[in-house]
Amino acid sequence: MKLAAIDLGSNSFRLEIARVEGERIITEGSWKETIRLAAGIDKDGNLTPEAQNRGLNALARIAEKIRGMPRNHIRAVGTQTLRAAKNSQEFIERAEKILDCKVEILRGKEEARLVFQGCSFALPPSDETRLIVDIGGASTECVIGRGHEMIEGESFHVGCVNTSVTFFKDRKITAQSMERAILSAASVLDGSEYRFVKGNWQEAFGSSGTVSAVSSILAALRITDGSITLYALEQLKDKVIHAESIDKIKFDGLKEDRREVLAGGIAVLIAVFKKLKIDVMKVADGALRYGILYDLAGRKLQRDPREASVERMMNAFHADKEQAKRVGDIAVNLFKTMSPHASEDSARFLRWAADLHETGLTLSR
């Protein structure tokens, strides 16, 4: 069985095609196009025509690669920029026509869950509680979990693209602009960092482009073996400031498209290290696309992890499953009468709501 995950991210659009073999997902091909969607928001909060066209042209090329695949084997998702843009629906409708499949705009917590799931399958099995930090173009997901299950997760509205555009828009880098970028990123975490601070987890990992790029640069400069520490980040920050301009940033292994947003990414990562009191962070493969693939595979094989989470909660609190099923059946029948063309996914959410409602009633007795 072949599956495809399409990630309409704030920095880049990505496609991952994989096949399912037993419990394993094996990648057959991956494609990435740097779009910088987050840099294409105008002063009124709308995606500019230029940004939309960049994205739609990339999706047309992606559509060629998924031609012939069953539509229910494909999941396309949008993240923070498409959550925030006032005219995102206009873009989504055009994107769906090109891809010939639904584009789902992920809520922040769902994005965090999928990020953790993708990383958890890529990392060695462990009983330790893990922190995953994923710095994207316009948001940063912080997630704590164990095994393959998220315990706590949130998406913060700060990323490498929007930070770079705001604080290094003239392409100049100074100690002052870097410090402002770090303080701004840290302020976004204010009030929520206590949930993710050291003491709530045993191991810290980072995923996606910023963390991977920083790890590679630190290893190439022989500052570390690829592990990331605050001391190493401060050294890298000083080198970037010394370059004085985005155009003059040069490190072995640094790709051109990553250079554009490296300063913003470093600022966000330093803020995360300071606020969450991280000593050392290692790189985790996986992240959102792999989380989508494993989630999709679970649904196709009737092993949806969300179903398992609801069932575990009902069992833990001895909820009345028969009563929950009766309520769920009535709710779904009413829903299908009112919305005959609604998807099975919508009906599934209603059943979970009935299950969790019954669990809540059990707790309150």
Provide a role label for each language-model segment.
Residues 1-27:
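N-terminal basic/disordered segments at the start of proteins
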Residues 3-7, 130-134, 204:
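Short glycine-aspartate micro-motif
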Residues 10-12, 139, 284:
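Short linear Ser/Thr-Pro motifs
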Residues 17-20, 40-71, 79-129, 144-146, ...:
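Helical "lid/coupling" subdomains associated with nucleotide-phosphate turnover
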Residues 24-36:
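N-terminal glycine-rich anion-binding loops that anchor highly charged ligand groups
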Residues 76:
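Dinucleotide-binding Rossmann-like beta1-alpha1 core, especially the glycine-rich loop
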Residues 135-137, 209:
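Membrane-embedded alpha-helical core segments of multi-pass
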Residues 138-144:
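Acidic, divalent-metal-coordinating active-site segment for phosphoryl/phosphodiester hydrolysis
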